[in-house]
Amino acid sequence: MENIIHVNINPLITGFGNWAVSWHGFFSFVAVLFAVVLVGRWAEDYNLDQDIVYHVAVWGIIGGVIGARIVHVIDYWWFYQNQPLEMFMLWKGGIGVWGGVLGGFAGGVLCAHINKYPKYVLTDLAAPALMFGMVIGRIGDIINGEHCAKVYEGIFAMSWDHAASDVSNCKMKGAGIGIPVQPAIIYEMIWNMLSLYIIWYFRFKLYPSGMLWVLFLLLYSIGRLIISYLRYDKIWVPLNFFGMDISITEAQVIAIICILITLPILIIKVNFKNFSSFQFIENSSKTRAEKRRQNKNK
């Protein structure tokens, strides 16, 4: 039992009646903020005006929030069907990452399409920033204990001990307050960090534009498909392979679809390029503001 990681932190930072701010919500906000700041700073590396990037980011955030909440509500419909008002209480936490990714993608691409912005370049710009944001967001998941992982007492098992922890919603699945479970959220955070390293390594090495985003989707899908087997989520497709339960959840269904789409795209379309002697932005002593004004006058 000495190998168990105990989390005994109140999942709510503050609250007033039905209004509450959770650590999950706080770190989700910080993650989005960092992602927006990063894409703004990296914009000039892609010869993009920061105003364009921020314009698309607003649409992406709106689409991401809507998509994330919809996917979460669908996955936990057994809870929300009896408490429908809880669907709109975003400040309490509760999002589906897949919904955030795909909803944000849809919102951003729609904005780029309407305004004739280079959408594939913008998706490549967003890929590492979004993965970085996911790493930050997982800190809130670790504190809140939102994910129902499978009961486990081995090395690095996790136990949420605070009475208000969201893990209390996992009682019907054998988990609950003070019960050691798989550190699935830690594994996912580590996978996201590794994926961030891979994405950053291939930044400016893959073309045509859009391939870095495809790589992002593939990496996240692989991690989510595998790690979800350590969690208890609603089963969408019951499967049994020679007596072994390999039933598939909502997140895994989406992950499999993404893998089936992104892997062939990377195999067929991606090309590698050595940029060691190539510069997207020539060296200059000009400030960012001066560069933006110069680009606007072109």
What are these regions (language model features)?
Residues 1-298:
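A feature for loop-to-transmembrane-helix boundaries and adjacent hydrophobic helices
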